[in-house]
From Swiss-Prot:
Role description: Probable cyclin-dependent kinase whose activity is most likely regulated by the cyclin cyl-1/Cylin-L. Acts partially redundantly with cdk-11.1 to ensure embryonic viability. In contrast to cdk-11.1, not essential for male and female fertility.
Catalytic activity as recorded in UniProt: L-seryl-[protein] + ATP = O-phospho-L-seryl-[protein] + ADP + H(+); L-threonyl-[protein] + ATP = O-phospho-L-threonyl-[protein] + ADP + H(+)
Designated gene of the protein: cdk-11.2
Tissue: Expressed in somatic cells and at varying levels throughout the germline (at protein level). Highly expressed in the germ line of hermaphrodites (at protein level).
Keyword Cytoplasm: yes
Protein name: Cyclin-dependent kinase 11.2
Predominant location: nucleus
Gene Ontology CC entries for this record: cytoplasm; nucleus
Localization (cell): Nucleus; Cytoplasm
Chain intervals with Acidic residues compositional bias: 164-181
Presence of keyword Acetylation: no
């Protein structure tokens, strides 16, 4: 008979039996039986520790004696009265101390190894006879167990029980047998469920036969208000019932049908056509690929080859590059990432946003795409390439003692005002208009560039409700007087003042106000335009600097004396210039008003853009003008030539004055 008891992961079997031959019996010795041996072992360990400590002290004493003897001998060898200091002495003592510590650690490690070996017992077959005799009572041989049974007087009175300890891994929780799940039921109402008293639905071979299908059963989950809407599977809807109110107007009627309809029917037809058009639009949009904004979908800069550097500014540097696939030449602007830990530069975000919002306009530079490099700090913007900037063109003409003609001035100003008018209608301020930010192509098209300071503005009449914009904008020479006097807010007149300065530069071939500081710039403006008063500029008292500084009074009239006295512009042109350089921003001309000015309609007319002066661009490495422009000039020169002679000149692409007569003639 056997009894099993479970204790954690061990199972102990206790059996009652009288058969001693099949069972191995042993007695469990009391816990204090090997106490004497443990005490003896501890005493020996203490003695060994004491000996080790004594040996260590003797070794240290010997080292100290050697050190003192060496020191004494060194002092004897040194001259009398001289005190020397050996730099190597502290190092040698430190090394001796480290050697002693290393020897102590090695001795302790050897002692630990001996103790660990004493704990791990080897099998009886590998032990010596002496070690077998000195083994603990827990490892007594079978003969010892037999003697214990003989010498024990109470052995016969004890129960003949045998304890067998087996390592059996058993789960503390009783596991259930696996059962196949045949059916299950949802507790929540997630759909129509067959009632428990309803028989299972049979398979019907002919699915198309409506008579072989059973009627739709009612379920407890069907609400009362939906029972009337359930249609049996056996029923079929008629064509008239199947058509909804919109399906009746799903087809566009003919002209005769349309005329015969009433107004209500025509209205329903219009609504149906509108719904169909919106549905087609939604379907077309749904078929488009999903657009994921951000830099992750941008092309790599390796798609372009950088040809040369064009310029470097405050917020980035510009390169001339070529697309390796299309061979298109573009301008690549690399944004500066000086504080990349703070995120993408706000100036770069504004420039990209404003250029995209401005859209496609002939007089605004067009953005093609955003490119990324190998690192997060390499972000480029690909724009259309324009050969010149207006400032370099003016410098080139001034070095050759040339000026813009009146017709050329009108062409440049009309293009500039057209681009600014488009921006202001979209509520965009450029805030950095100057000749170096105006580009001009070989074909004479002017384009506004560098939107790094551009920003949207509001239309609120109340000055407190407008956006608070920073006054530190616009290059100093083109900055309006209200910006120099620190206003609370500003709007489109700041751009119009810059355009007035640019127009004066087109006429004079140099900047008009060249101040070296803000106070000096204000002084030059007031010397040219006169010191303003509260009568001509009522809102000037709200400017911060005006209330802090007292400006000397200057009478206006210097602007007229310069431009009219030197006959740089006629009266109509001066009126336009004076309207854009008005001190009071409320009375300053807008872009639309300037475009409608009489100066553009009077003689001389604006010349075509192709007739503007063009020079080889530095950004093109002194490349020649395009071929088609040379052909247009050649055609103009050949207009007065004879047809045969013109055809010959056109064939060889030469001018008439380049031909030299010769004495060769054909005899008839």
């Amino acid at each position: 008979m056997s009894n099993y008891s479970t204790n954690g992961s061990r199972k102990i079997r206790i059996s009652n039996s009288d058969d001693d031959s099949r069972e191995t019996r042993f007695s469990i010795q009391p816990r204090n039986s090997h106490k004497t041996k443990e005490e003896r072992y501890r005493d020996k360990e203490k003695e060994r520790d004491h000996e080790r400590h004594h040996d260590r002290e003797r070794r240290d004493d010997r080292y100290r004696k050697v050190d003192s003897r060496d020191h004494r001998d060194r002092n004897r060898r040194s001259p009398a009265g001289s005190r020397t200091y050996c730099r190597d002495e502290p190092d040698r003592r430190r090394n001796n101390h480290s050697d002693r510590n290393r020897r102590d650690r090695s001795s302790e490690r050897d002692r630990d190894n001996r103790s660990s070996k004493s704990k791990t017992k080897s099998p009886d077959s590998l032990r010596s006879k002496s070690s077998r005799k000195s083994q603990t009572p827990n490892h007594l041989p079978d003969d010892g167990k037999l003697f214990d049974r003989i010498l024990d007087p109470n052995y016969k009175k004890k129960e003949k029980t045998v304890m067998e300890v087996e390592d059996v891994e058993m789960s503390p929780v009783e596991m259930l047998d696996e059962e196949e799940v045949s059916t299950f039921t949802f507790d929540d109402a997630c759909g129509p469920v067959r009632p428990s008293n309803e028989p299972e639905e049979k398979d019907y071979k002919s699915e198309g036969d409506p008579e072989s299908r059973p009627a739709t059963p009612k379920t407890p989950l069907t609400p009362d208000y939906l029972e009337n809407t359930i249609v049996s599977l056996n029923e079929t809807l008629s064509d008239d019932e199947d058509k909804g109110p919109d399906d009746k107007y799903g087809k566009t009627p003919d002209k005769e049908q349309w005329e015969s309809m009433t107004e209500n029917e025509q209205k329903l037809h219009r609504d149906a056509m509108k719904k169909r058009r919106e549905q087609r639009h939604r379907e077309a949009v749904s078929k488009l690929p999903v657009y994921y904004p951000g830099l992750r979908g941008c092309q790599h800069i390796s798609e372009y080859v950088i040809l040369n550097v064009i310029a470097e500014g405050t917020y980035g540097e510009v390169f001339r590059g070529k697309n390796t696939r299309t061979d298109e030449v573009v301008a690549l602007k690399r944004f500066k990432m000086e504080k990349e830990k703070e995120g993408f530069p706000i100036t770069a975000l504004r420039e990209i946003n404003m250029l995209l919002k401005a859209g496609a306009h002939e007089n605004i530079v067009n953005v093609k795409e955003i490119l990324v490099g190998s690192t997060k700090t390499e972000v480029y913007m690909a724009m259309e390439y324009v050969e010149h900037d207006v400032k370099s063109l003016i410098d080139k003409m001034r070095s050759r003692n040339q000026r813009f003609k009146t017709g050329q001035q009108k062409t440049l100003m009309s293009q500039l005002l057209s681009g600014i008018e488009h921006m202001h209608k979209l509520w965009i301020l450029h805030r950095d208009l100057k000749t170096s930010n105006l580009l001009i192509s070989h074909s004479g098209i002017l384009k506004i560039a560098d939107f790094g300071l551009a920003r949207e503005y509001g239309e609120a009449r109340d000055i407190e409700k407008r956006m608070k914009l920073t006054p530190i904008v616009v290059t100093l020479w083109y900055r309006s007087p209200e910006l120099l006097l620190e206003p609370k807010t500003y709007s489109t007149p700041v751009d119009m003042w810059s355009i007035g300065c640019i127009m004066a530069e087109f006429i004079m071939m140099k900047p008009m106000f060249q101040g070296d500081s803000e106070p000096n710039q204000v002084h030059q403006i007031f010397q040219m335009m006169g010191t303003p008063t509260e009568q001509i500029w009522p809102d000037i008292k709200e400017l911060k600097v005006w209330n802090m500084v007292e400006f000397p009074p200057v009478k206006p009239g210097q602007l007229r004396r310069i431009f009219k006295g030197e006959k740089l512009v006629n009266e109509t042109g001066f009126d336009l210039l004076n309207g854009m350089l008005c001190l009071n921003p409320a009375n300053r001309l807008t872009a639309s008003e300037a475009l409608q000015h009489d100066w553009f309609s009077e003689h001389p007319k604006a010349v075509p853009p192709e007739d503007l002066p063009v020079y080889p661009a530095k950004s093109e490495l002194n490349a020649a003008p395009p071929e088609n422009r040379r052909k247009n000039r050649l055609e103009a020169l050949l207009a007065d030539e004879e047809p045969e002679r013109a055809a010959l000149l056109r064939q060889f692409n030469v001018k008439a004055e380049q031909l030299k007569p010769s004495g060769f003639q054909l005899r008839g």
